Swiss-Prot record:
SUPFAM superfamilies: Prokaryotic lipoproteins and lipoprotein localization factors. This is Outer-membrane lipoprotein carrier protein. The gene is lolA. The keyword NAD does not apply. It comes from Aliivibrio salmonicida (strain LFI1238). Its main location: periplasm. It is found in: Periplasm. Monomer.
Length: 198
């Protein structure tokens, strides 16, 4: 009888775990990772608008480096306080605070451990896919779908814009490890315009 009661308690806790709690638990499985990705941007009708590739490094909490190599190179780096967006083609770097970035894109949620970050979102789960949607009063209008296994392995994510345009990112390699701290520093190259929005 005792075993049955314990089993029921365990099943109840599993059944009633919130999708947000489950996603947070999975994200907390590893402290960092490195991955290569492919990107495909689709129109609302499903036509391929763009394809690209790059690599990402995340060190939780708050550190990430997102490097898109093709079709147009750009780099997004944060040291946990400042986020730099560098576009070599236009020779410009934009700086903003990490909290500002969190309110503009749910991707930053992958890197943080701050419970209040989730206040602007609702989370739904379908297997290993978690749909992170902005609440009605949020300034964010895009939906974010992260695909993450119970082990914490992120296999990819998608961003669905309000107009139906979709960007799919699939991780072609994934290595759970702590990237070197030096990956999360950025030095503004000479001759580059600076747009400081902090």
């Amino acid at each position: 009888m005792k075993k049955i009661l314990l089993s029921l308690c365990f099943l109840s806790s599993v059944a009633f775990a919130s999708p947000q709690g489950e996603l947070t638990d999975r994200l907390n499985q590893n402290k960092g990772f490195e991955a290569s990705f492919t990107q495909k941007v689709l129109s609302p009708e499903g036509d391929v608008l763009m394809q690209g590739e790059g690599d990402v490094k995340i060190l939780r909490p708050n550190l990430f480096r997102w490097h898109t190599q093709t079709p147009d190179e750009n780099l997004l780096v944060t040291d946990g306080k400042t986020l730099w967006y560098y576009n070599p083609f236009v020779e410009q770097v934009t700086l903003m605070g990490l909290d500002q970035a969190t309110t503009q894109t749910p991707f930053v949620l992958l890197t943080r451990n701050k419970a209040s970050d989730w206040d602007n979102y609702s989370v739904a789960q379908n297997g290993d896919a978690f749909t992170v949607s902005p609440k009605s009063d949020s300034a964010i209008k895009s939906e974010f779908i992260v695909r993450i296994q119970p082990s914490g392995k992120v296999t990819g994510f998608s961003v669905v814009e309000q107009d139906g345009q979709r960007s799919d990112f699939n991780f072609t390699t994934f290595e759970a490890k702590k990237p070197a701290q030096s990956n999360f520093m950025f030095t503004v190259p000479d001759g580059v315009d600076i747009d400081d929005q902090r």
